[in-house]
């Protein structure tokens, strides 16, 4: 069978593969703990459920406009005003099948083959693959100081004649790092100066800790006209725990949104009207659930960090937000894929290899589950990796024996 060059170059989502493996083990009755997932466990907002049910009861579940229904656009406009102090028109907004699709369609709208997309390391696993799908080239920018916090110089040294767009994801998946206000200001000004598109992936912007506040990219923009090349991405998946609803959006100049709408109209058409109604319910409804989730995640983060700090040799930077911890386990195994496979095979703990995010020797651990799962998972990992651990471990009535050194 002959496949296209692009198809042969694309790898599947590692998190989805891990989800499948974990599900198969659970079906067999194995006591799997999943620290690889990227979805909160809190309940979906009741306002979202009621809005969906109300529309379903009308029996009018039809095609939706390719760029989203007017009522959802109105809610997104209000959201943008509230959190970014920026008023935009409906023509500046597109609703997509999740923030992932919004980013993908934005890249398709602006990239030509062989042009370059720059993003700081560590990066979300989909950015390089999205660039490939556009026939473009992903260019990772590793901070010179080895931290998770880029400086403008780290981006500048990667800029070339083929650079078309920079993607910034803060708070960051997988590190949880919230980039400094100075860096956001610098990157906005630099991209304006160089006439480069800037995609701000703000999907986690309300899930931040320690009293920090979301950073508004528009605050530093000199050009807020229809010539602006800022593309703002967000969605309901993370902050409202609505991962299965697949509603995200982009805010950008009218020309970009028009191009994105044309592309999306030939790919998926508009998102399901039922799911758009759910998003409206979440955006317009009671917001206390977001703060409740944020507080829970901050507490879970603190517990995970305390447990990881008991690992001798493991290096961990305290996340500023999201629901991920990105820890350096290279003292035990430099090959993160090998380490991740070892942990699921030996102690049934699912993690995501750091190599998928551009940093070998690291593991991404999610702390959005129950505290009992978090603590037990880290204890299992420590037992498997620490050579000073006892020879036996009991998981329920099951006895595990170390048969490795």
PLM regions with names:
Residues 3, 7, 11-13, 18, ...:
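PLP-dependent class I/II
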Residues 35, 58-62, 75-78, 82:
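Glycine-rich loop-to-alpha-helix module at the N-terminal edge of alpha/beta enzyme cores
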Residues 63-64, 291:
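Short, surface-exposed loop/turn segments at secondary-structure junctions
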Residues 67-68:
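Short beta-strand to alpha-helix junction loop
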């Amino acid at each position: 069978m002959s496949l296209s060059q692009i198809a042969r170059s694309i790898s599947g989502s590692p998190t989805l593969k891990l989800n499948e493996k974990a599900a198969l083990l659970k079906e067999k009755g194995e006591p799997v703990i999943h620290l690889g997932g990227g979805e909160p466990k809190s309940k979906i907002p009741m306002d979202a459920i009621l809005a969906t049910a109300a529309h379903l009861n009308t029996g009018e579940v039809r095609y939706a406009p390719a760029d989203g229904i007017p009522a959802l656009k109105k809610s997104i406009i209000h959201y943008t005003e509230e959190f970014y102090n920026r008023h935009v028109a409906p023509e500046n907004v597109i609703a997509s099948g999740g923030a992932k699709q919004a980013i993908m369609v934005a890249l398709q709208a602006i990239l030509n083959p062989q042009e370059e997309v720059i993003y700081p390391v560590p990066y979300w696993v989909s950015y390089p693959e999205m660039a490939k799908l556009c026939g473009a080239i992903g260019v990772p920018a590793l901070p010179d100081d080895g931290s998770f916090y880029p400086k403008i110089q780290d981006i500048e040294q990667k800029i070339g004649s083929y650079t078309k767009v920079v993607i910034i994801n803060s708070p960051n998946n997988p590190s949880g790092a919230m980039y400094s206000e100075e860096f956001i200001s610098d990157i906005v000004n630099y991209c304006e100066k160089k006439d480069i598109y800037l995609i701000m992936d703000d999907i986690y912007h309300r899930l931040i800790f320690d009293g920090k506040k979301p950073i508004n990219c528009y605050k530093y923009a000199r050009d807020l006209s229809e010539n602006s090349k800022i593309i703002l991405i967000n969605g309901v998946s993370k902050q409202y725990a609505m991962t299965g609803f697949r509603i995200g959006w982009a805010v950008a100049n009218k020309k970009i949104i028009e191009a994105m709408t044309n592309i999306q109209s030939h790919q998926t058409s508009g998102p399901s009207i039922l799911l758009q109604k759910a998003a409206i319910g979440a955006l317009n409804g009671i917001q206390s659930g977001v703060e409740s989730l944020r507080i829970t995640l901050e507490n879970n983060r603190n517990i995970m960090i305390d447990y990881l700090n008991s690992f001798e040799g493991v290096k961990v930077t305290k996340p500023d937000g999201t629901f991920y911890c990105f820890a350096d386990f290279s003292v035990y195994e430099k090959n993160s894929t090998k380490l991740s496979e070892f942990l699921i095979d030996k102690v049934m703990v699912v993690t995501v290899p750091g190599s998928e995010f551009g940093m070998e020797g690291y593991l991404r651990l999610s702390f959005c589950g129950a505290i009992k799962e978090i603590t037990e998972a880290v204890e299992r990992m420590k037992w498997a990796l620490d050579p000073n651990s006892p020879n036996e471990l009991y998981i329920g009535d099951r006895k595990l024996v170390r048969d490795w050194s």
